[in-house]
Design a protein with these regions (language model features):
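Short, internal active-site loops enriched in acidic
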Residues: 9-11, 42-47, 188-192, 237-242
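DNA-contacting surface of Y-family translesion DNA polymerases
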Residues: 88-229, 239-255
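Nucleic-acid-contacting surfaces of polymerase cores and analogous helical-repeat interfaces
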Residues: 2-147
Length: 259
């Protein structure tokens, strides 16, 4: 999981922003025993790059006066928003880093990459005016784990781990007072190939038992191709508020629930 935190209102000097980030890293370690990475900068794009820079336990600050030099040296595949396919296209064009990208005009980038060209033009210059949106509606609730060692699909431990993930998702979605209508199982194999399998339901669920039942049904139809598992994930999506179900229930269903 990751999140953005805007500490620019009121204006906070960057030294205090870094202190906040360090406190968050410390609290995560104390509460969970897990390391985390944090990045501090003056916009979302650069903060994201900073947080990714020295994972899994990094802390990077990109100041405004240092941003252009940082971006110019950054390999193009490390740019947030530039995926594997686009980075390969850029490398074929001779664009290997941020400096190379910055040599192309806005017209050239939009001609090649259409609407994305404007974003690439700005990112190469450290420009990102997107606001932090702290109140975005959550679209899914998920839990996943990278295993301490690889397991075969038919090992009992796989079922036990999935059971724990289902319980975690159930507890979190209940806390949000939500229900999910789509259940997704995610598996990453030892060769780093990844598959997801989903099932959509007529009504929302949140209970541990309901989530587990659907996940186990999905698991039965997985072909592992004799590969062992290194990561498991469970997600509930297509979320609705619990209150919405009260408005859709019929009188007959309501009377049945009272019996």
């Amino acid at each position: 999981d990751e999140a953005f935190l805007d500490v620019t209102n009121p204006k906070i000097p960057i030294k205090y922003a870094t202190t906040i980030a360090k406190f968050i890293k410390r609290d995560i370690l104390m509460e969970t025993g897990l390391n985390s990475s944090a990045g501090v900068s003056y916009n979302k794009f650069l903060a994201k790059l900073a947080s990714d820079y020295n994972k899994p336990n990094g802390f990077t600050v990109i100041r405004q006066e240092d941003a252009q030099e940082f971006l110019d040296k950054l390999p193009i595949e490390k740019f947030f928003g530039i995926g594997k396919v686009t980075s390969k296209t850029m490398k074929r064009m001779g664009i290997k880093n941020g400096y190379d990208l910055r040599q192309l005009s806005l017209y050239e980038l939009e001609k090649i990459f259409k609407s994305k060209g404007y974003q690439y033009y700005n990112f190469a210059r450290g420009i990102d005016n997107r606001p932090v949106e702290p109140y975005r509606e959550r679209k899914s609730v998920g839990s996943e784990i990278t295993l301490d060692h690889n397991y075969r699909l038919d090992e009992e431990e796989v079922v036990d781990i999935l059971d724990e993930l289902c319980l975690d998702v159930s507890n979190r979605i209940k806390y949000l007072n939500k229900l999910g209508k789509t259940v997704t199982l995610k598996i990453k194999f030892e060769d780093f190939t990844q598959i997801t399998r989903s099932t959509s339901l007529n009504s929302g669920i949140s209970s541990h038992e309901d989530i587990r039942t659907n996940i186990y049904n999905l698991l039965r139809n997985i072909d592992d191709n004799n590969l062992q598992i290194r990561l498991l994930g469970v997600t509930l999506s297509n979320l609705i508020d619990v209150e919405e179900t009260y408005h859709n229930i019929t009188l007959f269903e309501y009377m049945q629930s009272k019996d």
